[in-house]
Amino acid sequence: MEFPFDVDALFPERITVLDQHLRPPARRPGTTTPARVDLQQQIMTIIDELGKASAKAQNLSAPITSASRMQSNRHVVYILKDSSGRPAGKGAIIGFIKVGYKKLFVLDDREAHNEVEPLCILDFYIHESVQRHGHGRELFQYMLQKERVEPHQLAIDRPSQKLLKFLNKHYNLETTVPQVNNFVIFEGFFAHQHRPPAPSLRATRHSRAAAVDPTPTAPARKLPPKRAEGDIKPYSSSDREFLKVAVEPPWPLNRAPRRATPPAHPPPRSSSLGNSPERGPLRPFVPEQELLRSLRLCPPHPTARLLLAADPGGSPAQRRRTR
């Protein structure tokens, strides 16, 4: 396949490996390209044209390989170029093969389901003008060595009859294990364990950043120590202790006279009324005659003397009767 730009300058090696980023490979020393030329756009054009040619050769309604699909999936494409025939000195593309790891549920010889993640052949195309010249085997063998897998460990997505004959001719893959999906696996597929897919570029980038500039993680939050379980007071005890506290009433009630504090050792309670500790002892009984005698002997008050001096004519008995 020919293109209007220099393919030989874009792909220095005979076989070029591209991932989802579609970055141009390193250029040879001394090779110059104008700055205005977008190399990634040229790569996207090549992949789109190869996908269309492959879909046409397999009688597919739409291409299964395109630059946009490559950028949205973790697939790898191997592109084979022809440097011998240099039409207009720009080189040409012979074909490509696209692979990628996929998680599949496949049946074994006992029809048991197995969850595997093998390397899958997703698209394979060699230009019609250069078929049966060994280019397909060269490209396929290079992919096996680069991915470090054996032919019987592969799973092929909807292979064409040409591809099945190719695998039978060059790798003796003939007996298939029936599946319920569109993938084809061959006898010996379960004999070896499949290599897990490479870590994602994002995870690799994060791990490298952590190695260069490790960020200290926040310390784990410590929980407060659990209190030792002691004797729990009953609710009634708490109430009694609360009532023991003397609460002073607000002003002016707090100025009222308080009751006298009872003696520390009160006298023993007796059935006698005179000995009652609550009412106290009564005064002894005084006869009426003695009370009157004490009043007569008591000197008069100064005020009474003044009244007697103001009324000398009246006798004390008369004054006592008129009052």
UniProtKB/Swiss-Prot annotation:
Subcellular localization: Cytoplasm; Membrane, Clathrin-coated pit; Cell junction, Focal adhesion; Cell projection, Axon
GO molecular function: L-lysine N-acetyltransferase activity, acting on acetyl phosphate as donor; tubulin N-acetyltransferase activity
Highest taxon listed in the record's lineage: Eukaryota
Positions annotated to bind acetyl-CoA: 124-137, 160-169
Modified residues annotated as Asymmetric dimethylarginine in this record: R305
Protein source organism: Macaca mulatta (Rhesus macaque)
Transmembrane regions: none
Protein name: Alpha-tubulin N-acetyltransferase 1
